[in-house]
Amino acid sequence: TAMARAGYNIAVVDTDPQMSLTNWSKSGKAAFDVFTAASEKDVYGIRKDLAEYDFAIVDGAGSLSVITSAAVMVSDLVIIPVTPSPLDFSAAGSVVTVLEAQAYSRKVEARFLITRKIEQATMLNVLKESIKDTGVKPFRTAITQRQIYVKSILDGDSVFESNDGAAKGEVEILTKEIVKVFE
């Protein structure tokens, strides 16, 4: 939503088996076009339909699958969201393995995105050290643990329909950081 608000023409490809993004887009509130890909073949096929967009974002499941691997192979930037939880970071390791394998044919830029950040949490420091060990850079911006993110999902809105200036601000800063990767 933040990229569309900044004037970019955005497409989002939903590869998550839950199809929550696809279902949300049916409410008519999406500020971008949504495509659905239920298989790795769909991911490769949709790519040709995305040429007219400034950015195409692939939303996937948090676990490694054939479709996740296909999404990595067609991506220019892979954002790996992780929470300060050992189990969450362990699951992200499989995506890093796919990125390393993909580097033999075409290097794909990747960044970790820390979500549900609680500033003084001990696990946050452990997570930051674990990220360093992978060789994949983290974004400077992290998404803080905020109730507005959950409320927005439950209400079928984006955070930009809320009055939470701090949440909107961190999403806008993250968006600028993502765009900068492509400059």
Briefly describe each language-model feature range:
Residues 1-69, 153-161:
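P-loop/Walker-type NTP enzyme "switch/lid" segment
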Residues 12, 58, 80, 112-114:
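Structural beta-sheet core signal
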Residues 65-85:
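Inter-motif core of Ras-like GTPase G domains
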Residues 92-107:
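Conserved C-terminal guanine-recognition region of P-loop GTPase G domains, centered on the G4
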Residues 118-120, 128-157:
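Beta-strand-loop-alpha "switch" segments that mediate conformational coupling across diverse proteins
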Residues 149-172:
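Inter-lobe coupling/hinge region of RecA-like P-loop helicase motors
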Residues 178-183:
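Short, hydrophobic alpha-helical segments
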